[in-house]
A protein has these predicted regions:
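Cytochrome P450
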Residues: 1-408
Length: 408
């Protein structure tokens, strides 16, 4: 990974709004990637500031401003939003384009991820969850990332796409590099590698259509009047590929780290496993507190927002974790309250680009809790093994060593 690009301060950026902040940086003393964001607030950072790091970008810190950027796609565009700027950059469908263009693919995908559609995936998610836990439950130890969280949502995603599960580790490595790399040249090369894999996949899938997302996209392409092109099919799959192989894994890692260190929370959740309403409320709170994604937008046109001059093509960073801990919106924002009744968190976004996979993500985490806690009720972090963390567009852990007393 190369040193992040540092850009000179543009003329429209006032000096008092400039802060030297690198969203990718992990210093030796950092133990939790959330802490680097909280430190911005603790140190009195302006609610809207500009950093010269990673090609230069704005960062919004307040809930209302982040919500506005989600809602207002006329000003804050999803199109060509990469940090650092990477060329060439794919026109990702549907999240990489704005209305009305994005509707074509979103309307194709929405029916696949409704609550009713996702409920039909329950049996498969549970089967996979049990199979993974069976492999290590009697060992008394596991690397939660390598043995469980890195395999459950990613394996399920590849199953839904109709991809070869024998190549799971290869796919994970490609998506992981995409999310972590700062060097735009290396990222462009990685994008090319992913497109190569997807091109090969679709050449095979053309002759082996099935009941999966990839086949649905190909059938849409071949439907007269759909307007769906081969390139758009691959662009859409690229987005699903990089989005589907990381965020739920990272969210699970933070949740299980919390459960490993706070027995009272373990017991409280264990008491809710067969109570859907209470479990659902607990899940919303877990997703609020552990929002792992840092979202990007690109300013579409020159505008003055809350007294700040934003220029067309400026990049904007939206840290969901700070929106979800804004005391102007949430009572006791730093506290994990599994009974919280009012919870308008932004973990899954808002507006036309709200996360398509939110119901599947909740199902996977709920099922993991339901299967894990009855079998491995008391577990802890193995402090003898160092834990490596990462920051960037998705925050998380490269490993999470856990131990428990195995049953005799």
């Amino acid at each position: 990974v190369s040193t992040p690009q540092t850009q000179s301060i543009p003329p429209h950026v006032p000096a008092h709004l400039v802060l030297d902040f690198d969203l990718f940086e992990v210093t030796p003393e950092l133990r939790d990637p959330f802490d680097k964001w909280q430190a911005l607030l603790d140190n009195g950072a302006p609610p809207i500031f500009w950093t010269p790091r990673n090609g230069g970008h704005w960062t919004f810190l307040k809930y209302d401003d982040i919500r506005e950027a989600y809602r207002n796609h006329e000003t804050f565009s999803n199109r060509h939003q990469s940090i650092p700027r990477t060329e060439p950059w794919p026109l990702l469908q549907p999240n990489g384009v704005d209305p009305p263009e994005h509707s074509k693919f979103r309307n194709l995908l929405v029916p696949l991820f409704t609550p009713a559609a996702v409920s039909l995936m329950q049996e498969e998610v549970r089967r996979r969850t049990r199979m993974l836990i069976d492999a290590f439950a009697d060992r008394g130890a596991c690397d939660f990332v390598a043995d469980f969280s890195g395999k459950l949502p990613t394996g399920m995603f590849i199953h839904l796409m109709g991809m070869d599960e024998g190549r799971l580790s290869e796919f994970i490595a490609l998506a992981d590099f995409f999310m972590r790399v700062e060097d735009p040249v290396a990222k462009a090369r990685n994008v090319g590698e992913i497109y190569g894999v997807l091109g090969e996949f679709f050449r095979h899938k053309e002759h082996h259509l099935g009941n999966d997302i990839a086949s649905l996209l190909l059938r849409a392409r071949d439907t007269a009047g759909s307007g769906v092109t081969q390139q758009e099919v691959i662009d859409c799959t690229f987005l699903l590929f990089v989005a589907g192989l990381d965020t739920v894994t990272s969210t699970m890692n933070f949740i299980w780290r919390h459960l490993a260190t706070v027995p009272a929370t373990r017991r409280e959740i264990a008491g809710h496993l067969e109570q859907p309403d209470k479990l659902s409320r607990a899940l919303e709170e877990l997703f609020r507190v552990y929002a792992v994604s840092i979202i990007y937008r690109r300013v579409k046109k020159d505008t003055v927002y809350k007294g700040v001059q934003l220029k067309a093509d400026d990049m904007v960073v939206l840290p969901d974790n700070l929106a979800n801990r804004d005391p102007a919106v949430f009572d006791r924002p730093a506290e994990l309250d599994l009974t919280r009744k009012v919870n308008p968190h932004l973990t899954f976004g808002l507006g036309v680009h709200r996360c398509l996979g939110s119901h599947l993500a909740k199902l996977e985490v709920a099922t993991a809790l339901q299967e894990w806690l009855p079998r491995i009720a008391d577990f802890r972090i193995d402090t003898a093994i160092p834990v490596k963390i990462y920051a960037g567009p998705v925050m998380g852990f490269r490993s999470l060593p856990l131990r428990w007393d195995a049953r005799a």
